[in-house]
């Protein structure tokens, strides 16, 4: 494939083959250090762990080395941080992928604690093993831990479809439908009941950020809330307005405290926003149900179901712990409210349909960056997160606009790109394609990042031919941009052109290596 100059735009047809560079000799093989299993599940626990048909069962709990987790997270790269507060979070959570024969490419979430959180490594390991014995389809299960010097890390199943907080409070295109909200409440109540039955009843800081959505869009409860910071004993990191009254009095968490926090989640589901419990109770007592319901749900829910949920939330938020219902009562009340059981969660949540894992291309010949690793694994979700986090950093210098060119048409074009960015961030890939196409069609400004993002959108919509065209367009705009080659590698693999895909991966890694050397200097 020939390269175009950065000032030219090319047609939409795809050349027959992408460009190739000379292949360097492969590096010597690296030894693999397998994980050390701590224990295996008994038959009863294994049966309890059966999840949705398309979801892989959680592996046995294991102890990991720091080197393994560093490799899995790309050296704890900032691009792999998935904590809601980003790098400002006190305990960072990273996306990762287990490498080597023992890892099997499994996606993981790695929680990295601050150095003073768990001073006693034995206490940390014992607590982690206790939580690691739990296995349930309604939970993002803990699959391992790491104690290395001052480092304390937990390893859990990775949930790729964000948090309940993200879907409730930060949506741009579509509010969660009513039946899905009822499903969330029921699934989390089931998870809490399971933990209680397994003698792990205390869940710390239960809130909408602890509710995660798996590859099928099913809601799951994060296992991280089953462990607390052992040094300061804090169980609630959120605003004190949302903590149980008894915790403010004596600093202790009880099963009734967990029920109170569950009540705050019910209020979140009803209102679509964070309302302090005292204010929510005042609204419930003095006004109609409609006052607390999210306006986007108007006319889309059953008054009887909403009344039941509001009444249950009110009981959970009672000041006196003895006046709150127990976990079993929550489950029994929420179970009859479940509707649309035949509709998959991913449909109601509005996330892409889960697919079988595509065949990955052969291993490249160079060490890869997080972007390269994601592309070599065909991990479209990881690629999406990286493209969101890098934003338009690589577009600098590709366009220089004079004052005369800053027209209303230009403003409209940038507005289309902005709308595309919002849709891309929120995984509304079809809308992102439409908005980015409006931007591209004007032609005043050429952005390699827009082509890369639209390429990924096409991949998410099972359009590999269009994805390859856009990745090649990105290369034409920015001939030595590694991301353009990486996106071509993914599209080629989707088109079953594995040899060409490997060439693209190697070429991209060479470009990245060359870029790093130029930054460091001689």
Curated annotation (Swiss-Prot):
Record-annotated active site: 205 (proton acceptor)
Gene Ontology biological-process entries: brassinosteroid mediated signaling pathway; defense response to fungus; innate immune response
Entry annotated with the keyword S-adenosyl-L-methionine: no
InterPro entries per record: BSK, Kinase-like_dom_sf, Prot_kinase_dom, Ser-Thr/Tyr_kinase_cat_dom, TPR-like_helical_dom_sf
Protein keywords: ATP-binding, Cell membrane, Kinase, Lipoprotein, Membrane, Myristate, Nucleotide-binding, Plant defense, Serine/threonine-protein kinase, Transferase
Region (Disordered): 1-54
GO molecular function annotation: ATP binding; protein serine kinase activity; protein serine/threonine kinase activity
Gene3D superfamilies: Phosphorylase Kinase, domain 1 (3.30.200.20), Tetratricopeptide repeat domain (1.25.40.10), Transferase(Phosphotransferase) domain 1 (1.10.510.10)
Function: Probable serine/threonine kinase that functions as a positive regulator of plant immunity. May be involved in the regulation of pattern-triggered immunity (PTI). Does not seem to be involved in responses to brassinosteroid (BR) signaling.
UniProt cross-references to PANTHER family, sorted A to Z: SERINE/THREONINE-PROTEIN KINASE BSK5, SERINE_THREONINE-PROTEIN KINASE BSK1
Family designation: Belongs to the protein kinase superfamily. Ser/Thr protein kinase family.
Protein name: Serine/threonine-protein kinase BSK1-2
Species of the source: Oryza sativa subsp. japonica (Rice)
